[in-house]
Amino acid sequence: GGSVDSAAAEEVFESNCASCHGADLSGAGPDLTQV
């Protein structure tokens, strides 16, 4: 179901993207707010 996929994607983001970009998207990684 979509909700399961969404939850999994959110979990992946939390553990991977956020670790680099920061939880508020202002971390050391590229600025994701402009994508």
Curated annotation (Swiss-Prot):
Which InterPro entries does UniProt cross-reference here? Cyt_c-like_dom, Cyt_c-like_dom_sf
Q: Could you tell me which PROSITE patterns the record lists for this protein?
A: CYTC (PS51007)
Record protein name field: Cytochrome c-550
GO molecular function ontology, one term from the record: electron transfer activity
Q: Where are the transmembrane segments?
A: none
Modified how: Binds 1 heme c group covalently per subunit.
Query: Which of UniProt's keywords are assigned here?
Result: Electron transport, Heme, Iron, Metal-binding, Transport
Its biological purpose = Monoheme cytochrome which functions as an electron carrier in the reduction of nitrite by membrane vesicles.
Taxonomy, superkingdom:
Bacteria
Which residues take part in binding heme c?
17, 20-21
Is Transport among this UniProt entry's keywords? yes
